[in-house]
C-alpha cells in the first residue's frame, strides 16, 4: 500500500495520512476544517516500512484500513522548568 502524507498549513507538525492521493472522502469534514488546506509532503510505501518517525507503524496501517486516514499530531510541549520544580519539590507558596 502506498499512502499520501499531507502536512497542515494551520497546525505545525500535524500530518494527515490518506489511502490515495487527493482522496479525503473518508476524512471527517470537521477534521478537514481544523487541518486546513492539506499540502502534499510525500507518497509513502507503508507496507515496506517497519518504523515511521513518531508514529506507530502498526497503528497507521490499521487506521488507514479501518478509517481511511491517520492523523499524526505533534507531541505535547513539556515545560521543563515546571517539571524540574516538581522534581526538586519547589513550592512557591
Swiss-Prot record:
The residue ranges of the YcgL domain are: 1-85
Tell me which Gene3D superfamilies the record gives. Answer: YcgL domain
Q: Mind telling me which Pfam families this protein's record contains?
A: YcgL
Renumbered to this chain, the signal peptide range is none
The UniProt entry, under HAMAP family, shows: UPF0745
The protein's name is YcgL domain-containing protein Shal_1837
Q: What is the organism of origin for this protein?
A: Shewanella halifaxensis (strain HAW-EB4)
